[in-house]
């Protein structure tokens, strides 16, 4: 509750402030001012004082009676049953404080008396044991000593004298020892009594025997049998071992307080693992999370902060550990030592689609790549290195289509210089602006190539203006970005462009260590039918050699072969050289870093660790979407979903298509890529599409014989594409068809009521003038009075000059009979309309 002041409390109880302060002083409260704060405890104290002062103290019940009734059924012979009702009654009486104190005092006195009695009993037993021991020693000495007739006295008097003298001293010492070790004495009490009984009885028998047979020498007494906890007697439970059985029981006791445990939490941890570390049931952790407002399951992955909060709330000590220890050890092992040398620049060509990026590269490489690409547009990242008169340059050609945003961002990260290609006749377009943003984010310099300068509509000043808005200012205008006019078709300005690029490279002073182990980045990856996983690698530092063990993201393997961009095998690749490598165990993600490691064991260990981490992150993301939106989606209509199984030729195209298709849809329809991969369409893909009612899409890949057979037998929808535009358009059409249609109303005509007639057949007939549109027979109508709809029905009769008419046009008079409606008045308007179904669009 919130705290209030004395003044606010006086207003609530409707009493003067002075009177309330007087009552608070009488109750012993320290308040003297109306602005002081009154706590809940002080309110309770004041209330108790007021009740006692008015002699209205609430009497608490001193006796509570609980009655419990249990009904059960007892079956008897003959399929009969008897209802048995058991009633129990318990009475709880509240005792006064005086009675409680008296009972506590009585219990304390009884406990002290019991302790004194136990102590006296122990002392008496010790005293008795010492006396018996003294008697036995006297008897033994009397039997062992000779008894001549001349001297009868010394024999009996020699032995007992020291025993009797030592008895009080040993008795006192034993008593003191017993007081110091009460617990040990009580624990060994039964065992000592049994030993004494055996030791006391055996010598008596031997004395009688030895007195009768004085000729025989006395035999030494056998050592008393010990009752060890581990002995067979204790285990088998022979006679007299009742107390020992109790000792042999385990000593576990329930903990009196909460057990605080040390919980070690990594970057992620599942609910079940966290519960195991805290030694509680998983259901308790789930229940605790529900109370915090977060629904979870026992297998859900929690992040480090959430797990730490749960463990600390439950009272345990938390130790946070980093899961990157393995990655850190790998980074330490990858040392780059050696002489640094200058390396060739890595240049990425970016720009809008159809602005001539690949054509410009074709002219530089003296190749014809653009002509061989589907639709004349680039859909992969291409990596090439070119020997020019001024040195070697490595080019990365990126797609310009909007779907390939991730590819362009990846190209900007792996590059040193960006060539921004802008068509002189088209100007700055959306992907041009995006390329500028990627270059700025990566912190790499720009060189603007104004292409298609030979076209009639070329306007260089317009491009400079538009790019200056994006923060790219030409050197001619006082900026730091070179603008070069080129024509990829004619070859104009290409030499000047290369010169500008190499000038930027000299300013950057790019260096590498060729003698170090290779390190690079994955530009693209695909699954080749004959060669397996193939990855395009751009070596950034060191030298990659055939036979090296490489770690690439969550994949690893030994480089079995290396090919350059022309498909020729090479043995090694230095800095800034793009190569294709074979030998990985899977297709790595584009953008993953590649490192040469020392041994296969280390590579496998790190790869498996990364795979597990990726799986945990994926599961956490999936669970977050499922459970957090449970209550939001409750009661809403379920979305219609178009399921797609997508197979592409390279990993980059798969990423681009998944991003583009996932962005389609609205609140009613959505696209879900339930299966995706690199390579041809296999039989398992067809079975997945069959089980999930999905459509099979192949992008630059084909289906094998097994998949085609399943598609034909089951009538699945399978389509092949080689241009990204086509697949996006087809999916849009499919989603539009799933939306259904909207019903739209078109007003056909409006008639105004001028007079009302009565007909024995139709009832009220409205004499109308058509003032707008055309009135049709057997169409739905609305009756409007003062422009407010008062009736909606159907036009039953339409006549003109006593003849039935199918339609009456504007400006003509007619008689209208409304079905099941007779309240037509002069001045009403009759609106005739029709309902039309209209196809919906995204």
Curated annotation (Swiss-Prot):
Residues 451-454 are annotated as: G4. Residues 149-159 have a biased composition (Pro residues). This is Translation initiation factor IF-2. The keyword Cytoplasm applies. It holds the Pfam family IF2_N. Keywords: Cytoplasm, GTP-binding, Initiation factor, Nucleotide-binding, Protein biosynthesis. Residues 342-509 form the tr-type G domain. One of the essential components for the initiation of protein synthesis. Protects formylmethionyl-tRNA from spontaneous hydrolysis and promotes its binding to the 30S ribosomal subunits. Also involved in the hydrolysis of GTP during the formation of the 70S ribosomal complex. Belongs to the TRAFAC class translation factor GTPase superfamily. Classic translation factor GTPase family. IF-2 subfamily. Residues 397-400 are annotated as: G3. Residues 94-259 are annotated as: Disordered. Residues 351-358 are annotated as: G1. Residues 96-138, 173-202, 226-235 have a biased composition (Basic and acidic residues).
């Amino acid at each position: 509750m919130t705290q209030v002041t004395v003044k606010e409390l006086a207003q609530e109880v409707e009493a003067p402030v002075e009177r309330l302060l007087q009552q608070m002083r009488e109750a012993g409260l320290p308040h003297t001012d109306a602005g002081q704060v009154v706590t809940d405890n002080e309110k309770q104290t004041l209330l108790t004082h007021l009740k006692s002062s008015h002699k209205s103290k609430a009497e608490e019940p001193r006796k509570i009676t609980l009655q419990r009734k249990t009904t059960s059924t007892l079956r008897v012979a003959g399929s009969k049953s008897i209802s048995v009702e058991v009633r129990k009654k318990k009475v709880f009486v509240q005792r006064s404080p005086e009675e409680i104190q008296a009972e506590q005092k009585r219990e304390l006195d009884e406990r002290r008396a019991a302790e004194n009695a136990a102590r006296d009993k122990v002392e008496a037993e010790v005293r008795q044991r010492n006396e018996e021991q003294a008697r036995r020693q006297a008897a033994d000495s009397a039997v062992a000593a000779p008894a001549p007739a001349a001297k009868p006295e010394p024999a009996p008097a020699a032995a007992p004298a020291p025993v009797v003298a030592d008895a009080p001293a040993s008795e006192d010492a034993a008593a003191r020892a017993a007081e110091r070790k009460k617990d040990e004495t009580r624990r060994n009490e039964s065992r000592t009594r049994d030993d004494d009984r055996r030791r006391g009885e055996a010598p008596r028998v031997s004395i009688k025997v030895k007195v009768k047979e004085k000729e025989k020498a006395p035999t030494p007494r056998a050592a008393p049998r010990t009752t060890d906890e581990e002995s067979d007697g204790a285990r088998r439970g022979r006679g007299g071992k009742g107390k020992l059985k109790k000792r042999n029981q385990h000593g576990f006791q329930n903990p009196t307080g909460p057990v605080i445990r040390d919980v070690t939490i990594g970057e992620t941890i599942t609910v079940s693992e966290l519960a195991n570390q805290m030694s509680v049931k998983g259901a308790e952790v789930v229940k605790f999370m529900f109370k915090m407002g977060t629904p979870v399951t026992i297998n859900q992955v929690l992040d480090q902060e959430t797990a730490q909060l749960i463990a600390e709330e439950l009272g345990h000590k938390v130790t946070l550990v980093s899961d990157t220890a393995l990655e850190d050890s790998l980074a330490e092992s990858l040392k780059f030592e050696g002489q640094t040398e200058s390396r060739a620049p890595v240049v990425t060509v970016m720009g809008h689609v159809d602005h001539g990026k690949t054509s410009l590269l074709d002219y530089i490489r003296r190749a014809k790549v653009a002509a061989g690409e589907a639709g004349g547009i680039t859909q992969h990242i291409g990596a090439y290195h070119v020997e020019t008169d001024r040195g070697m340059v490595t080019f990365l050609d990126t797609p310009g289509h909007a779907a390939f945003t991730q590819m362009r961002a990846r190209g900007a990260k792996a590059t040193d210089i960006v060539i921004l290609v802008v068509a002189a006749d088209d100007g700055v377009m959306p992907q041009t602006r995006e390329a500028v943003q990627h270059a700025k984010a990566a912190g790499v310099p720009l060189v603007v190539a104004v292409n298609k300068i030979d076209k009639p509509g070329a306007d260089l000043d317009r491009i400079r203006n538009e790019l200056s808005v994006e923060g790219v200012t030409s050197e001619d205008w006082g900026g730091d970005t070179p603008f070069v006019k080129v024509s990829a078709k004619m070859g104009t300005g290409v030499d000047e462009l290369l010169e500008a690029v190499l000038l930027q490279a000299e300013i950057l002073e790019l260096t590498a260590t060729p003698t170090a182990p290779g390190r690079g980045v994955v530009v693209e990856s695909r699954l080749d039918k004959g060669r397996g996983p193939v990855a395009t690698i751009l070596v950034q530092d060191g030298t990659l050699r055939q036979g090296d063990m490489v770690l690439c993201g969550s994949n690893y393997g030994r480089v079995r072969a290396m090919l350059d961009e022309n498909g020729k095998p090479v043995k090694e690749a230095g800095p800034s050289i793009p190569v294709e490598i074979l030998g990985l165990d899977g297709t790595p993600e584009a953008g993953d870093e590649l490192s040469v490691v020392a041994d296969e064991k280390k590579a496998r260990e790190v790869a498996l660790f990364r795979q597990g981490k990726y799986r945990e992150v994926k599961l956490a993301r999936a669970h977050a979407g499922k459970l957090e939106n449970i209550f939001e989606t409750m009661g809403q209509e379920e979305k219609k979903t178009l399921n797609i199984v997508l197979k592409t030729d390279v990993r980059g195209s798969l990423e681009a298509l998944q991003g583009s298709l996932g962005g389609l849809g609205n609140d009613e329809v959505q696209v879900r890529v339930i299966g995706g991969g690199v390579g041809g369409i296999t039989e398992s893909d067809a079975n997945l599409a069959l089980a999930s009612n999905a459509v099979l899409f192949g992008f630059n890949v084909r289906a094998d014989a097994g998949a085609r057979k399943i598609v034909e037998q089951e009538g699945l929808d399978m389509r092949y594409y080689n241009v990204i535009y086509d697949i996006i358009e087809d999916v849009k059409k499919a989603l539009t068809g799933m939306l259904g249609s909207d019903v739209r109303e078109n007003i056909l005509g409006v008639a105004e009521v001028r007079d009302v007639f009565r007909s024995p057949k139709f009832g009220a007939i409205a004499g109308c003038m058509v003032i707008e549109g055309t009135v049709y027979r057997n169409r739905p109508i609305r009756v409007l009075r003062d422009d407010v709809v008062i009736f909606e029905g159907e036009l039953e009769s339409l006549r003109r000059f006593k003849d039935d008419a199918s339609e009456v046009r504007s400006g003509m008079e007619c008689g209208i009979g409304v079905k099941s409606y007779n309240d037509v008045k002069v001045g009403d308007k009759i609106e005739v309309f029709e309902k039309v179904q209209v196809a919906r669009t995204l």
